Every structure is written in C-alpha cells, then in structure tokens.
Design a protein with these regions (language model features):
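Positively charged n-region of N-terminal signal peptides that target proteins for export
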Residues: 1-8
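Catalytic-site microenvironment of enzymes
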Residues: 4, 13-14, 21-347
Length: 347
C-alpha cells in the first residue's frame, strides 16, 4: 500500500508539471504546419501517458500485495511450535547438556551458587527415549535433606528481608536451608510422599517426551533450596517443586500453587521472571483441575519463597493438598496426569 501511495503521488506531480507545460505552449509564436498538426493528433498527450503509468503501477502493486498475502498464509503459526521457544510467556534459555543418567552437581561458577550452604549432593538427568521434545522439566521432591534445618541461607540474593510469612516469618533475611516438612495424619513424612510423587511424575513426563532433571532422586540429597534452584536454572527449562501444605487444618483444602507476592516483583531476578512463574503455576492448576483434583480457592497463594527469589527459569512450588489429603499411589497417579497436562499446556 505504501508503494502504491508513493507511485500515485509521483504520477500526480508529473501530471501537474505536464499541465504547466501545456499552458506555456497555448500561444505558439508560429502557426502550426499541417504535418505538425497531424503529429499532434496521433501522439498521446502527456496526461494520457501519466494515466497509463499510474494504471500499470496500480496493477503491479495489487499483484505484489496478493503475492505477499499468499506467502503470509503459507507461513506456520509460531505459537503452535511445541519447542517452548515461541510461547509468549516462555523465554528460551541456553542450558548445560547432560547424558541420560548423568549426575548434575552445583557448578560454583553459576550465578547465585555462592549463596548455597549445602551442595555436596547431585541431581540426576533422565532422557526420554521417544517423541523427545528437547524440554527438560526440573522435578524437585520437597524436603529430604538431612541437616537442612541446622544451617541458614539468604532469603533473597540481595540480602533483603522477606515480605511475607511462611516457614520463615516476614522481615527475616535468612531462612533454614531446607525445612523438614510435615507429617500426614497417618504419620507418613511429607518428604516420603513428595519423593514418590516425583518418581511417578518423572515416568509420565518421560513417556510424554520430556526429559526430567530429578533434583532429589532418593530419600536424602545434600542440596539446599538455593542449590536446587541454581541447578534447575542451568540444567532445566522449568522447575517444579512438589509439596503438601503443613497448615494444621482438619480437612483437605485442595491444591494450589505459590504465586509471586507484589513485594518482591521489583527485585531481580524476580522482576524479569515472575510472570513466567505465575503462568507455569496457573497452567499446572488447570491441568490438575481437568483431572478432577480439588483446588483450593482460586488456585494460588502469594508467599515469598527462597526458590522463587533465586529462579531464572519458570519456577513454581505446587502444594498438592495438606496432611489430611489422600496420598495413595492411585491419587498420586491422577495428580501426576494433571501436572503433565499442565506442563504441556505451558510449553
């Protein structure tokens, strides 16, 4: 359209100049000969020439625009690409590459690695064998670090105080490296259930074509919350921490994710990633809802977490119930199906 407008304006200028030239010739100094008169009749006027040029330009422009429309229609919709790169809420991150079954330890050169206090353990990488999507999901079975409550780490990378309460109260600048977790009403430790949940989720993600970084692959891993987060930042495309809430209630209140509170949205790296964190959490809750899981309230609760404060990939803590919740394998299988659907919805 811009090309057509430029051509039309050029044609109008030529037309104007032609008109001016014609006026200058209206009073000839000598009478025309018969031959000159014939030539004048047979030759097209300058106005007719301009009209012909503009007409041809219009035809060329219309043909060009039609070709451009055909090319646009043939281009694939980038939002349908399943690699995750084109998701509007996902920013592709360069990550380290590991083989199937390879241990992934904390590299001291990684950003925020020096904030970790417990980091002698390793995560484990598992690769899908079919329909691989080239997406690594970090699965973090909450708790399960012996000695985790005996040391503390900074709540925020910049040393600022927590803005909301949780396991650690608002105003604190340090939190226990890894809390011990609660126990279900039947006495089962939360750390045992989160590990079983992680194992079931791992198998389902692998079957769906996702690679899985198992942050805790056994009953105990010597990685604190900062180390777990930093490893996921560098070896995974997202980080999902599995928990059940120790709220002390006498009924099962359902699932929810920990959203990012407003008080830390201006702090880096949260400022650059909080929308991704919340988008991932919301997608997981929708997946759980679709599989019939009970959802607490609107599905989210804003809490200032160490995990969120250090994350540079989409990261969320999902609470799958509380001490009153059923944690049989059948229930965990269903929850895992919902989480896989949520992962697929996000990517």
């Amino acid at each position: 359209m811009k090309r057509f407008t430029a051509i039309l304006l050029t044609g109008m200028m030529i037309f104007t100049l032609a008109s001016c030239g014609k006026k200058a010739q209206d009073t000839p100094t000598e009478p025309e000969t018969e031959t000159q008169a014939v030539e004048k009749v047979e030759m097209p006027t300058e106005t007719e020439a301009v009209t012909e040029v503009v007409t041809e330009a219009v035809k060329d422009t219309q043909q060009t625009e039609a070709q451009q429309e055909e090319q646009t229609a043939e281009q694939p919709d980038e939002e349908q690409n399943n690699s995750g790169e084109n998701n509007s809420s996902y920013q592709y991150v360069e990550r380290a590459s590991y083989e199937n079954g390879e241990s992934v330890s904390l590299n001291p050169s990684w950003q925020y690695a020096d904030h970790s206090a417990i980091n002698s353990g390793c995560a484990v990488m598992y690769k899908a064998t079919a329909n691989r999507k080239n997406i690594v999901v970090g699965v973090n079975a909450g708790h399960g670090t012996s000695g985790g409550t005996s040391v503390k780490t900074l709540c925020h990378p910049d040393g600022s105080a927590k803005t909301t309460g949780g396991t650690t109260g608002a105003g604190a600048t340090k939190a226990v490296a890894v809390s011990g977790g609660m126990s279900f009403n039947d006495g089962t430790p939360e750390s045992s259930v989160t590990l079983r949940m992680a194992q079931i989720l791992k198998d389902k993600l692998l079957a769906a074509g996702y690679d899985v970084l198992m942050v805790r692959d056994g009953s105990d891993v010597q990685l604190d919350n900062v180390a777990r987060t930093v490893i996921c930042n560098n070896a995974a495309d997202c980080h999902i921490a599995l928990h059940w809430d120790g709220d002390g209630l006498s009924y099962d209140k359902g699932c929810f994710y920990i959203s990012v509170p407003g008080g830390i949205k201006g702090m880096e790296p949260v400022a650059s990633h909080w929308q991704q964190h919340d988008a991932l959490g919301a997608s997981l809750i929708e997946g759980l809802r679709a599989h019939g899981a009970k959802i607490n309230g609107n599905g989210s609760m804003a809490i200032d977490l160490t995990q969120t404060s250090y994350s540079t990939v989409p990261s969320v803590d999902v609470e799958l119930g509380n001490a009153c919740s059923d944690h049989s394998d059948a229930t965990l299988e269903n929850l895992a199906d919902g989480l896989v659907q949520g992962v697929e919805g996000y990517f």
